[in-house]
Regions:
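Glycine-rich and polybasic anion-binding loops at the starts of cofactor/ligand-binding domains
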Residues: 1-131
Length: 131
């Protein structure tokens, strides 16, 4: 499980330090800050969302997100669960971008959930780039 609260990764509740057998994970903001060429190249690619206003808004304001890579031929047995939590006041909006790369003949189950208190207004604009 990967947990993000208020836009910040919470390492204390994550499964595994950097992934598991056949897969690895990192954080989008960290990869961009380091200038990771494969991440920056994917940001510049045209995608099916060209002209999509919600995707454009996500691109303009995107914050952190997960970067998950599954090795060629790997079969990840346990689901990877990304939990995005909102809490506290005032009302908020979040814009995240996650990149998932799945190698040839590899498989995984990816679950995303978005949670927050019933009495808090929050808006989520998330984009998942799967390749």
């Amino acid at each position: 499980m990967l947990v993000v609260v208020g836009g910040a990764f919470v390492a204390e509740v994550a499964d595994g330090a950097g992934g598991g057998r056949g897969w690895k994970r990192g954080w989008f903001g960290e990869a961009v800050a380091k200038g990771a060429p494969e991440i920056l190249a994917r940001l510049g690619e045209a995608g099916p969302a060209d002209g999509d206003l919600a995707f454009g808004l996500n691109t303009a304001f995107m914050g952190d997100g997960a970067v998950i890579e599954v090795a060629e031929g790997a079969a990840i047995e346990r689901p990877i669960h990304m939990v995005w939590m909102h809490g506290g006041a005032p009302a908020s909006a979040s814009f995240s971008r996650s990149l998932v790369s799945v190698g040839a003949k590899a498989s995984l189950t990816l679950i995303e959930s978005f949670e927050g208190p019933d009495d808090l207004d929050y808006q989520v604009n998330t984009a998942l780039d799967l390749s």
